[in-house]
Amino acid sequence: MKKEDMSCIDCAVKNCNKMDKTYPDFCLTTHMDEEVLNEAMECYNEDENRKVTIAAAEVEYENYCKHTRVEEIMDFAKKINAKKIGIATCVGLLKESRILADILRRHGFEVYGVCCKAGTQKKTSVGIPECCEGVGVNMCNPILQAKLLNKAKTDLNVVVGLCVGHDSLFYKYSEALTTTAVTKDRVLGHNPVAALYTADSYYSKLKKSEEE
């Protein structure tokens, strides 16, 4: 691999974190595009970005390794003064989303949720191949989820188990700031990092190239 093609993903030093080692030759920090850096840092002067950045840092610091993600979402929501929480949920995780909504309501939040099958539109109506109806005839509709939550004027949206790609469309169309409570993985109990933890053992098949 050419040095100019290498990036943070190829680094095991992490000197940018604790500053107690030496940067690798290809480090993005030591080869930084100053124009891009300045553009990024300038964005933190925008009121919402500054508020969110400070709130996120405080949530991380105040209960580091003490609060679950559900608790951190509530901590964050309070710090940005979010009163109305939107939940964009997979229909298969509606039970878990109801539990999340109950918790949020007990902590004083208003909750409005939309499941992925709302509107009951057929998959074939948007050009999805008919064979995909083998796992259900109605399409997941993340754009509708986003637009209904936009209409409800939520302050913060929370994604619960939307499919790969459907989550991308939801993030694209959501007007409110969005965070994720659950990342879907039907095989690993919605814990996709388990495949990475076991990539040298049980899931070593993931490292095989398509040619193998």
Regions flagged by a language model, labelled:
Residues 2-84, 91-95:
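Electropositive, gly/pro-rich neighborhoods at or near active sites that engage anionic ligands
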Residues 79-86, 148-155:
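Short, surface-exposed connector motifs at secondary-structure boundaries
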Residues 95-145:
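Long, charge-dense
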Residues 96-103, 167-176:
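Short Gly/Thr/Asp-enriched flexible loops that form oxyanion-binding sites at enzyme active sites
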Residues 110-117, 169, 173-191:
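Short, acidic/small-residue loops that bind anionic groups at enzyme active sites
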Residues 139-154, 162-166:
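A short, acidic, amphipathic alpha-helical segment used as a generic capping/interface helix at domain edges
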Residues 179-212:
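C-terminal functional extensions of proteins
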